[in-house]
């Protein structure tokens, strides 16, 4: 008798994607982050669903409803903090997943990579609108500052901002629509993630060497299911440790003050995972220039497959490219630190230099290093 997982129309799809999937035998733990992102998404959707049952998207009651969730709802506090810190874990996994893709040349799978870039934009949009919902000071002012950036668009900017706000300032209409967006976007992310996987199944997984591994494949289950379970346990352990011991470590204390349009916080800054882009935005004195740099800092990822000049796919055997990759990582950490600092003398110039280096590395230095490595291969 044939196994049901191989014959049933629905089970067959799941079987081909997660059980009998031929997988390279040498993929490292850096390949765990895809499944961890799936786990993060499930955690976020479930905790978010329970939070939405008690949350009220109204300017007069939003802040109080979050307080009510934490104080009066059974285990509301843990659901709320799992959701808030789950977002941080999501972005840690996302950046590690992208870094892996960049290092090992996974961007050669054009369709998979491009869907990934779209996914990144969608996740960032979801996190942004979600941060507005508690209606604290940083929620309100973050929403005001970031949406206001669109006013830099010539001719239609001001109209566009007022259209997004649903009025002449961030108010009840803005909060209601942001809640609607925050509820629907995770399901769009889920659909895009499935498309991402469909495109990946077309080509099969890459591996650390970047060399085709068709002659050396092993089934996904049990070898990589057990490996993914270990990664999942470590993720859950980290998330629970963060949630139970330091729930506010990555948040902003200003968000415990109810939103007040008449009082501006001393330092307006987004959550830590957006600080690198915020630093790039602030490092350009011109408003439109800053907005374009902000957009390009993420959109540049879509051009990476075109900027790949090396004859080798992976960076495993390319020392110059490896060095520049880690310089890029250090540069992004520097930008993240600068984004959280006030706009004054030493930080401004460091932020500007780090922003220049970011674009220089991706657009010039890394492609040139790859060309030099191509020449050295002939020696």
From Swiss-Prot:
Cofactor(s) needed by this chain: heme b
Q: Name one Pfam family in it.
A: Cytochrome_B
Question: What PANTHER family does this protein map onto?
Answer: CYTOCHROME B
Q: Which family does it belong to?
A: Belongs to the cytochrome b family.
Q: What are the TM regions of this chain, as residue ranges?
A: 33-53, 77-98, 113-133, 178-198, 226-246, 288-308, 320-340, 347-367
Tell me the residue numbers annotated for binding heme b b562: 83, 182
Q: Give the location in the cell.
A: Mitochondrion inner membrane
Q: Which InterPro entries match?
A: Cyt_b/b6_C, Cyt_b/b6_C_sf, Cyt_b/b6_N, Cytb/b6-like_sf, Cytochrome_b, Cytochrome_b_C_euk/bac, Cytochrome_b_N_euk/bac, Di-haem_cyt_TM
Give the CC-aspect GO terms.
mitochondrial inner membrane; respiratory chain complex III
How is this protein organized at the quaternary level?
The cytochrome bc1 complex contains 11 subunits: 3 respiratory subunits (MT-CYB, CYC1 and UQCRFS1), 2 core proteins (UQCRC1 and UQCRC2) and 6 low-molecular weight proteins (UQCRH/QCR6, UQCRB/QCR7, UQCRQ/QCR8, UQCR10/QCR9, UQCR11/QCR10 and a cleavage product of UQCRFS1). This cytochrome bc1 complex then forms a dimer.
The name on file for this protein is Cytochrome b
Q: Species name for this entry?
A: Balaenoptera bonaerensis
One MF term from GO for this chain?
metal ion binding
Which keywords belong to this entry? Electron transport, Heme, Iron, Membrane, Metal-binding, Mitochondrion, Mitochondrion inner membrane, Respiratory chain, Transmembrane, Transmembrane helix, Transport, Ubiquinone
In its miscellaneous comment, the UniProt entry states: Heme 1 (or BL or b562) is low-potential and absorbs at about 562 nm, and heme 2 (or BH or b566) is high-potential and absorbs at about 566 nm.
């Amino acid at each position: 008798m044939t196994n049901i997982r191989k014959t049933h129309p629905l089970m067959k799809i799941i079987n081909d994607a997660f059980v009998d999937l031929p997988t390279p035998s040498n993929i490292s733990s850096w390949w765990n982050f895809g499944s961890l992102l799936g786990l993060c998404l499930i955690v976020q959707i479930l905790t978010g669903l329970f939070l939405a049952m008690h949350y009220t998207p109204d300017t007069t009651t939003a802040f109080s409803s979050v307080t009510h969730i934490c104080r009066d709802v059974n285990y509301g506090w843990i659901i709320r903090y799992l959701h808030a810190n789950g977002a941080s874990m999501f972005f840690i996994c996302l950046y590690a997943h992208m870094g892996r893709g960049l290092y090992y040349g996974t961007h050669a799978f054009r369709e998979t990579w491009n869907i990934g870039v779209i996914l990144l934009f969608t996740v960032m949009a979801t996190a942004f609108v979600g941060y507005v919902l508690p209606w604290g000071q940083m929620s309100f002012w973050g929403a005001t500052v970031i949406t206001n950036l669109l006013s830099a668009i010539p001719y239609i900017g001001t109209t566009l901002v007022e259209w997004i706000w649903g009025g002449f300032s961030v108010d009840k209409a803005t909060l209601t629509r942001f809640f609607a967006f925050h509820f629907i976007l995770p399901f769009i992310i889920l659909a895009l993630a499935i498309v991402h996987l469909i495109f990946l199944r077309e080509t099969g997984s890459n591996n650390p060497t970047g060399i085709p591994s068709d002659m050396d494949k092993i089934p996904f289950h049990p070898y990589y299911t057990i490996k993914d379970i270990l990664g999942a346990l470590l993720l859950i352990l980290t998330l629970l440790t963060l949630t139970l011991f330091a729930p506010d470590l990555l948040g902003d204390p200003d968000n415990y003050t109810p939103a007040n349009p008449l009082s501006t916080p001393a330092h307006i800054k987004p959550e830590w995972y957006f600080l690198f882009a915020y630093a790039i935005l602030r490092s350009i004195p011109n408003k439109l220039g800053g907005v374009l740099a902000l957009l390009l800092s993420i959109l540049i990822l879509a051009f990476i497959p075109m900027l790949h000049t090396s004859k080798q796919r992976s960076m495993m055997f390319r020392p110059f490219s490896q060095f520049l990759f880690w310089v890029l990582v250090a540069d992004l950490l520097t930008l993240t630190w600068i984004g959280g600092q006030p706009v004054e003398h030493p930080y401004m110039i460091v932020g500007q230099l780090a922003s220049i280096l970011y674009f220089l590395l991706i657009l010039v230095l890394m492609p040139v290093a790859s060309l030099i490595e191509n020449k050295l291969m002939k020696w």
